[in-house]
């Protein structure tokens, strides 16, 4: 019984990892409250672990956790190289910087590839615009001198902004072509309307002329009929006059014979 030690009384704790961690954090807070009255014990703890001038002061928590998970934990302080547990910090820092550089180079390579793809797409689009086929627009048929003059004036007055190689010039060229097509269509429609309006006038004139001719024919027919009637009447009168004269002559002859 005289050889009893702490090992003889030790038994493993029945709590799980979460409860143990909570008990450890509460123990840290309780021990802090026993000698300091500030409301931020864990910030006080971090400030004591990473004082000003420490190599890990400017690093993020994620970087420190990944490094300490992979390698042995370094002791804090302004002179971390003087502790026995610290290994060559400069070598570890160089390794960490190399890893950061590798990550940065990978991101830079990805950005370079994306930029190259964008440049290639732009060149392909410009080549397509340069090599696109020129569409032959079907113009409306010229039906009068005014139409011809309008078309020639449009060709001379249209400004040539740029060639078809550039993107802005192509857009302007297409807009101008659309406007020209619209104007030519409007001119064609106006000409059709004018021709449609002119045809009924010709028909009316033709109809009026035909009616006048018919009237004239009717008048000529009427005059011929009236002339025939007049001739017939004159003939009848002549016949009657001749018959009367013959009767008078016969009566005179009879009277002469009787005497």
UniProtKB/Swiss-Prot annotation:
Residues 228-240 have a biased composition (Basic residues). The keyword Metal-binding does not apply. Residues 192-259 are annotated as: Disordered. Residues 82-128 form a coiled coil. InterPro entries: DUF755 (IPR008474), HEV_TT_vir_Orf2/Gyrovir_Vp2_N (IPR004118). It comes from the Viruses. Residues 241-259 have a biased composition (Low complexity). Pfam families: DUF755, TT_ORF2-like. Keywords: Coiled coil. This is Uncharacterized ORF3 protein. It comes from Torque teno midi virus 1 (isolate MD1-073).
